[in-house]
């Protein structure tokens, strides 16, 4: 494993989802069914998320309640994170356990960026 990745993973071992665990894989699931990518997205840690993606993080892996990293980025209004995830192939149509996709999560969020995120999601065309 690359040194940069190891250093970042070490930091996430102190997160309550992974407390007491050694994280050996970017797709390792923590106590609440989330991965380090989910946590990085929730914390708006753009650099950490990028490193995880560059090292094989599964971008559309469902975590707690069926939320994907893109769902969290939309919920918390993190525009740059939404862009990063979409640019790296995240599927905006995946639904969580409540039947919500990224657009509906953005619409229902309390984020001041929700209109921009909805527009971004609606205008995004997946690369072929």
Question: What are the residue ranges of the model-derived segments?
Answer:
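Conserved ankyrin/ankyrin-like repeat signature
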Residues: 47-48, 80-81, 113-117
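Charged, surface-exposed interaction regions in soluble eukaryotic proteins
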Residues: 60-76
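Ankyrin repeat boundary signal
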Residues: 28-29, 61-62, 93-95
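N-terminal segments that cap or nucleate solenoid repeat domains
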Residues: 1-39, 43-51
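Ankyrin-repeat-protein effector appendages
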Residues: 1-14, 88, 107-128
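Ankyrin repeat A-helix N-terminal signature
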Residues: 8-13, 39-45, 72-78, 105-112
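Ankyrin repeat domain, specifically the short helix-to-loop turn at the C-terminus of the second helix
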Residues: 18-25, 50-58, 83-91, 120-127
